[in-house]
């Protein structure tokens, strides 16, 4: 690395040695991030200086130019409507240009600039911050060109800012911390950074940067070529994407485009797609083995790191061991990877996982394999789902088709592989969905706009979801059981298709937030209440439809050889939690029906409530999976 300094006689002085040491420490801490962002090493020395001393010198090199084309409105009503729009007054455009008489040189070590962040938040907190943080709404409205009068936050202005923010938002996420702390953060650059416009041939690059010593996030700006006075500073809003069609979709928030001519069909991906997932997961498939017979009454030694199992498995046929070498059963919380080694060295060891079970438990894979049952649009028991990484153009086309037909267009964005509704967002804003693609890998699913509701006497008609525990004994032959007890989760506020960021209205997971009320209704209390509210729908009939959906799901998941389907490994067993809702639908004959909608399949689910209210839960699970004894267990065979 070159360290720029003037000529010095003799050996380096103390200050230079100190600077060199500080730079080494800086590179040790931040070098990987800077390299990943493409920041040239020649700029690192001055970057450190500017970070240490909080040097914001972009104003010495650049200026903001405003271009406005005013069109006469036809009448006062039209002018008033125009004033309420973002960027009132016609085509209002800002540009950042080089104002330094000497221009900007890409090889100048000083050609890196800090951009401050005007607003940083997580999406679920945005509305509250706009309403409560002094001056924030006013600043954001001004930055976005939204007219704002008075001091009291107007709901209309708040709504406009929340809609327009997706044209200005950038994102990063922390690499370390809890699952909650790693949820992506969205930020809006200051007035200078937010005025930098898009170009497919950008003159500058930007990257978010978290300076750890001061725990402050900035955006770094540096030139990609030399610029003369008056030239525009631009960046690529779809940086890193080469595919022209994907770029067109990514740029829709700023460059509207009609995608109606594009097919929104999403057939199941080819075999190589699943092979790539297998390799990315570093999962090694097992060799073929024969089931190992054990003597009558054999006591199984269980190596387990799941606390709920350790605390509640009391069946006399199972005992715990700390030694993996002595174990008959591995019941592990983390995902197992090297099935090949296990099949070679310990084929007799049973375990609580199947090779390739991510096809069920990861949301994009679940949507892909489900198309085997329902074709490109998916089966009736899974909401229409698109993988935003691989199916963005199809989704945009589908969204625009629904919009043109006047159909409901509420969607829910979910990370591929997070539970507890983390980083999950309900929206009808296409720009928001497109931009969410830039954070973590996500799917977008049709939001259930007509859910079957449950009347809570203390609240009103609320959303609810149902969790079933299913036990997969084997793939070939396919043997699947459901635990007889199911669990219910309820929203805390009456359902309506508004206030889409109101967690307690649109979500049901309440047991992880100590400040939120958890409504507890046991299954045996729920069934008579449900049948009283919906006398035409006996619960036995509803559950039969639910089990029919489970049957189809596992049939398609096991229909193809790995990595396109679950692997038939004789030593594998598994317990999954399936979360679902009920949706009102109409059959072709006009009959109104409750259609189960599978939301997700969870590996190693939290069974705290099961253990608390049903002490025999894990005894039943282990008897079913490992002993093939179900007569005295609370399970029902589905397949």
UniProtKB/Swiss-Prot annotation:
Residues 295-639 form the TTL domain. It is found in: Cytoplasm; Midbody; Cytoplasm, Cytoskeleton, Microtubule organizing center, Centrosome; Cytoplasm, Cytoskeleton, Spindle. The gene is Ttll12. Widely expressed with highest levels in brain, kidney, liver, lung, muscle and testis. Negatively regulates post-translational modifications of tubulin, including detyrosination of the C-terminus and polyglutamylation of glutamate residues. Also, indirectly promotes histone H4 trimethylation at 'Lys-20' (H4K20me3). Probably by controlling tubulin and/or histone H4 post-translational modifications, plays a role in mitosis and in maintaining chromosome number stability. During RNA virus-mediated infection, acts as a negative regulator of the RIG-I pathway by preventing MAVS binding to TBK1 and IKBKE. Keywords: ATP-binding, Cytoplasm, Cytoskeleton, Immunity, Innate immunity, Nucleotide-binding, Nucleus. One of its GO terms (cellular component) is spindle. It comes from the Eukaryota. Interacts with MAVS; the interaction prevents MAVS binding to TBK1 and IKBKE. Interacts (via N-terminus) with TBK1 (via protein kinase domain). Interacts (via TTL domain) with IKBKE (via protein kinase domain). Interacts with tubulin alpha. Interacts with histone H3 and histone H4 (when trimethylated at 'Lys-20' (H4K20me3)). Interacts with CBX3. It holds the Pfam family TTL. Belongs to the tubulin--tyrosine ligase family. This is Tubulin--tyrosine ligase-like protein 12. GO terms for biological process: innate immune response; negative regulation of type I interferon-mediated signaling pathway; protein modification process; regulation of mitotic cell cycle. It comes from Mus musculus. ATP binds at residues 445-448, 463, 465.
